[in-house]
Structures are given as C-alpha cells and as structure tokens.
Amino acid sequence: MDPRLQRLIDERDLRRLAELYAQGADRRDKALWSSIFTEDGLIEAPGIRLEGRANIVGALDAMATRYLATQHRVHNQVVQIDGDSAHGETYSTADHVAIGAEPRTVVTWSIRYQDRWRRVDGGWLFSERRLVIDWTETRRLD
C-alpha cells in the first residue's frame, strides 16, 4: 500500500479512537472503553492516575456517581506515527452536569489530551491519555 494512504488510514483510526472514548464516557459503556485501551493502559488527569484497563474501565462507575450526564466533543488532533506506535495531542471540550447540584449547573472543561497509541494485532489502541485542563467554565442550566 502507498505509505501516504496508510498514513491517512492510521490518522483516521486514531481519531476514531478519540471519538469512541467520548462516546464510551458519555454512555458509561464499559465494553467500549475496554475495547479501546491496551491491557497496561494509563489515564492521568489532575489528581487521578488510573493504571491498567480494568482500573480505567472502573472509572466509569465513579463518573456515574458524580455526574447526571456528560457530553464530550472531539476537536482537532495532531499525531506523529512511527511504525506501530504514535503520539499526539487531541483537543476536546466536555460538559459535566453534577448530580444533586442546586441550582443545576454544567461545568465545561477545555481539555488537551496528550495521547499515546500502540498498534496491537493490526489495530490501534490507546496506551496513554494524559488530560491537561486549560480552563473550566461553570454556568447555570435552565
């Protein structure tokens, strides 16, 4: 295959993982999240470090106890691919509606994910996601 075509396919596959991550987070879909991380995957966020696929997937239970709803959106993504590994940055915004907050509010996070991926058995998976939160905004819901 032409290397330029392979690069386009790889870039699309990496972006698709970011989109599936967002969908899995918002639907609290453990099977989906399990399918997009390596067994030794890592998520880091301010005050949080989750190591291993089981711990990452388990974080969805914690999200369900804190947030009535979330909505993650994937924006631009820049990646560097080197054979069967890749790294890059994925921009995102995520809305979080807290359980029990009165008045009801939504907190928006502006996120830059520092991502690493590995190709495993012919398909790409996240090996690391490090969240950098650039800013937050809290607003009341009507």
Regions found by a protein language model. Give the residues of each.
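Short, conserved clusters of charged catalytic residues that mark active-site
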Residues: 16, 74, 112
